[in-house]
Amino acid sequence: MLLNGGGGQIITSPIIEREHRPFQLPPKNDRMSRLFSYLLLTRGIDKDVLYEFVRRKMIYESADYHNAVFVGYDTNGKPRHAHKRGTVTSNPYKGNVASSQPEFSFHWHGKSDRFYLFEAPIDMLSFISMHKENWKSHSYGASCSVSDRVLFQCLKDNPNIKNVYLCFDNDQAGQTANKRIAEKLNKMNIQNEILIPTHKDWNEDRQVAGANSPHKSAEALNLEESEVGTCQEL
């Protein structure tokens, strides 16, 4: 709304409506060789952990740019969120698919009373890889940001959760978010603890620990197509 000179006439600017794009998962590639190479060899994610998420159709390789796609589902099993991560290390692209709902970002529901919140899916997978014992029994979420929305949605959907572990990055943004969310949880009388990675993030901890040895190869990890299968078979 603008004033026209000194005459006082009000000129109303037209309202520009943004086109709503319905949420749609990126098309799947028929092979996942780049995905497995990136997550297993470059990022050091444990093979058994990764395969479990792939088997549940929570991770796949996109057909267009061969991104790793991390899918979040609602309680009815409908995809509501997808985070894309480039598999080319020289071009570290990352972003959420248009119209993704942040409260349903990449997460795992277990039956124990523990929930672990991370910034990125790869940090979540790295932490699980380092703490594999009974990992499926716990709950995890990756906000794909420093948001707390997936946490509070999981608290709503999973009444078993009584203890929350805040695991954001070891930097100013991550630790500021950890403290902000901890204050919210304290007001709700929900037990919580802040876990800080030794290095920048949990994937760096995983790699420094030796999981991403440069001597590893696809053969050492048994990455035959018959084992990893294709997206169409999953």
Language model segments and positions:
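Phosphate-handling DNA/RNA-contact segment within nucleic-acid enzymes
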Residues: 63-157
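Short glycine-/small-residue-rich flexible loop motifs, especially phosphate/cofactor-binding loops
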Residues: 36-37, 124, 182
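TOPRIM fold recognition
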Residues: 129-234
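Generic non-transmembrane alpha-helix signal with a bias for helix starts/N-cap capping motifs
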Residues: 32-33, 120, 178
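Conserved aromatic-histidine-acidic binding/catalytic patches
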Residues: 27, 113-115, 169
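Basic, glycine-enriched DNA-binding surface that flanks or lies within the catalytic cores of DNA
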Residues: 4, 8-102, 106
